[in-house]
Swiss-Prot record:
It comes from Kineococcus radiotolerans (strain ATCC BAA-149 / DSM 14245 / SRS30216). It catalyses: D-erythro-1-(imidazol-4-yl)glycerol 3-phosphate = 3-(imidazol-4-yl)-2-oxopropyl phosphate + H2O. Belongs to the imidazoleglycerol-phosphate dehydratase family. Its main location: cytoplasm. HAMAP family: HisB. Pfam families: IGPD (PF00475). This is Imidazoleglycerol-phosphate dehydratase. It is an enzyme of class 4 (lyase).
């Protein structure tokens, strides 16, 4: 069964297209008009082995907030749609990933119950402007938006880090690895991996 999705969403603030294939090879085509965000989403696709296409345009002349948030919303919706009924997946996964001095730990439960816990970023991280457009405060917000619309429980802990770029990128790479493992088919799992029979 193909685990793919294509979702478009347009508002007065942005237009977003996301296409993904959970069983891809990590091929990406990303254009959000926010260069650092493009870099992070490229890393997400590469290290999750999802094939990922993202095209987003928004009112970045005001702020990049709407474009970043709306892209995370559509990405979450596409992830959820591609998973289907979640039969046979591992469901739980975690990953710890370094980037030089930065270290991030991400735990995922593809539970159908959205939640996001985000802790440990160094003091002042939220005020840094990364790549000229992306403020550090957007990281938590986009992760919350993704988790809510993907309907996953997501725990992100930054264990170490100093460089603002590295702190964010370690989180994206750890998220990518955790998602990859969580959605992998487990040949020992019969049906839905829940005692309730539904996720």
């Amino acid at each position: 069964m193909s685990r793919t999705a294509r979702i478009e969403r347009s508002t007065s603030e942005s237009s977003v297209l996301v296409e993904l294939d959970l069983d891809g090879t990590g091929r990406t085509s990303i254009d959000t008009t926010v260069p650092f965000y493009d870099h992070m989403l490229t890393a997400l696709g590469k290290h999750s082995l999802m094939d990922l296409t993202v095209v987003a345009k928004g009112d970045t002349h005001i702020d990049v907030h709407h474009t970043v948030e709306d892209t995370a919303i559509v990405l979450g919706q596409a992830f959820r749609q591609a998973l289907g009924d979640k039969a046979g997946i591992r469901r739980f996964a975690d990953a710890t990933v370094p980037l030089d001095e930065a270290l991030a730990h991400v735990v995922v439960d593809v539970s159908g119950r959205p939640y996001c816990v985000h802790t440990g970023e160094p003091e002042g991280q939220e005020y840094h402007l990364i790549g000229g457009h992306f403020t550090g405060s957007l990281t938590r917000h986009l992760l919350e938006s993704f988790a809510f619309h993907a309907r996953i429980a997501l725990h992100v802990r930054v264990l170490a880090g100093r460089d603002p770029h590295h702190v964010v990128e370690a989180q994206f790479k750890a998220l990518a690895r955790a998602l990859r493992y969580a959605v992998e088919p487990d040949p020992r799992v019969q049906g839905i991996p829940s005692t309730k029979g539904a996720l």
